[in-house]
């Protein structure tokens, strides 16, 4: 079964982008291609089907130093997985240096690594969470820590899958404002979501996915319209813009 079919997508460095689509559109598979959890079928013409930073072949550990990715799977793995959330905020961020998902049993953690972890937590306004176990954090707190984990290697780009899932209205707004600050600081942001409300003002390009294909792509104002969204969500969607954000309703 083809989940993504003849999908062509280019995101330039510094081009903040939102990938928007309903459930089943292929968003998760697209992320898995970036993380090398899934692999695309070879093209008949021999052209590499996926390139990241211009390269088709990557050492996964090297790639993770340039591309930070935060997914709901990572959240569940660290907070609800084998470690049962017993690791602290600092330990979670430090694990980003070693691409591990749990305790740092065999890693050598230097004072420099701890300093960089503290800096990453501070960027997400999460430094007070350094000593707090993940399973005692709210959803919003844990999400900030996981993004700090992705930032700790100073990546060029950050891919966020449903970044505000599980947050209430106030927490979501504050959280997305912090993502906006990262964008303004020079980190390329790629938001993958099915919520229009999660698209921060800094986003310039929107890609609309539907049934594994790019239904439309272009500048944000021309993509976030009632016409386009009603088509990909297969329902009458109205759009309103306020303070740089877009809001949808049926």
Regions found by a protein language model. Name each.
Residues 226, 230-250:
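ABC ATPase nucleotide-binding domains
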Residues 154:
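Conserved catalytic motifs of ABC-family nucleotide-binding domains
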């Amino acid at each position: 079964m083809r989940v993504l079919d003849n999908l062509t997508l280019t995101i330039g460095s510094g081009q903040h982008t939102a990938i928007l689509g309903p459930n089943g559109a292929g968003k998760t598979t697209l992320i898995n291609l970036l993380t090398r959890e899934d692999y695309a079928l070879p093209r008949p013409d021999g052209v590499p089907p996926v390139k990241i930073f211009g390269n088709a072949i990557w050492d996964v550990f090297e790639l993770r130093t340039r591309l930070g990715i935060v997914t709901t799977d990572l959240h569940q793995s660290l907070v609800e997985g084998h470690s049962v959330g017993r690791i602290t905020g600092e330990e979670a961020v430090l694990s980003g240096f070693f691409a591990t998902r749990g305790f740092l049993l065999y890693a050598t953690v230097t004072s420099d690594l701890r300093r960089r972890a503290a800096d990453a937590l501070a960027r997400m306004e999460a430094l007070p969470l350094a000593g707090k176990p993940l399973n005692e954090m709210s959803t919003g707190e844990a999400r900030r820590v996981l993004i700090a984990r992705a930032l700790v290697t100073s990546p060029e780009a950050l891919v966020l899958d449903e970044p505000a899932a599980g947050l209430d209205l106030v927490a979501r707004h504050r959280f997305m404002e912090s993502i906006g600050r990262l964008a303004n600081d020079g980190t390329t942001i790629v938001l993958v979501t099915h919520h229009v409300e999660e698209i921060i003002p800094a986003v310039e390009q929107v890609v609309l996915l539907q049934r594994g294909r790019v239904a439309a792509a272009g500048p944000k104002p021309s993509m976030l319209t009632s016409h386009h969204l009603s088509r990909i969500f297969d329902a009458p969607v109205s759009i309103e813009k306020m303070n740089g954000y877009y809001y949808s309703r049926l």
